[in-house]
């Protein structure tokens, strides 16, 4: 038996066609059901759908064998006890520093609003920039407007939301996309089956 963890929401919509091309189909009635473990067209493969931030947790602890998670989640929560085996090239965006002007970034101690605390801390430490990180779970663009922060660190896709709120992306931190990850122990114990799936998914990219 092979178990795969997928993310809810936008990533799932882009993941399902990819998996179908690789030979794995989840029926609509399964997706719309209240079941926590979903059946697929293959009797030896089950799927679990969870919040994006929980995907690496399930895979790291061996609750599932494989998973598909955003690089932003892997950077933030760590990637211990799992292998990142494929960049799937879906749900693409960039993790960036944005502010109202370049001058706002010229501070002795920069106030940064973000939900990506660990990634932000690493980035500014590497730059040698002192910063105070203010963790927010949403409405990031509001922080500079109301004086809560000098800048934000967030995912940028088209940049339209930033522009609508008077923010400009100035500094690039990381390219983000969905990645296929595998539990280290599962890769040893189910090597042939997992390698076959990695190949199938790679061929469908």
UniProtKB/Swiss-Prot annotation:
The family database entries (SUPFAM superfamilies) matched by this protein are listed as: Periplasmic binding protein-like II (SSF53850)
Q: Where in the cell is it found?
A: Cytoplasm
What GO molecular function terms would the record report? ATP binding; ATP phosphoribosyltransferase activity
Which reactions are catalysed by this chain?
A: 1-(5-phospho-beta-D-ribosyl)-ATP + diphosphate = 5-phospho-alpha-D-ribose 1-diphosphate + ATP
The EC designation for this entry is 2.4.2.17
Give the matching Pfam families. Answer: HisG (PF01634)
> Which is one Gene Ontology cellular component term of this protein?
cytoplasm
| Gene Ontology BP term (one) | L-histidine biosynthetic process
- UniProt entry keywords in alphabetical sequence: Amino-acid biosynthesis, ATP-binding, Cytoplasm, Glycosyltransferase, Histidine biosynthesis, Nucleotide-binding, Transferase
Q: Its pathway?
A: Amino-acid biosynthesis; L-histidine biosynthesis; L-histidine from 5-phospho-alpha-D-ribose 1-diphosphate: step 1/9
Known InterPro entries for this protein? ATP_PRibTrfase_cat, ATP_PRibTrfase_CS, ATP_PRibTrfase_HisG, ATP_PRibTrfase_HisG_short
Chief subcellular location: cytoplasm
Q: How does it assemble?
A: Heteromultimer composed of HisG and HisZ subunits.
| Domain remarks in the Swiss-Prot or TrEMBL record | Lacks the C-terminal regulatory region which is replaced by HisZ.
Which family does this protein fall into? Belongs to the ATP phosphoribosyltransferase family. Short subfamily.
Task: Summarize the protein's role.
Answer: Catalyzes the condensation of ATP and 5-phosphoribose 1-diphosphate to form N'-(5'-phosphoribosyl)-ATP (PR-ATP). Has a crucial role in the pathway because the rate of histidine biosynthesis seems to be controlled primarily by regulation of HisG enzymatic activity.
Q: What name does the UniProt record give this protein?
A: ATP phosphoribosyltransferase
- Organism of origin is Vesicomyosocius okutanii subsp. Calyptogena okutanii (strain HA)
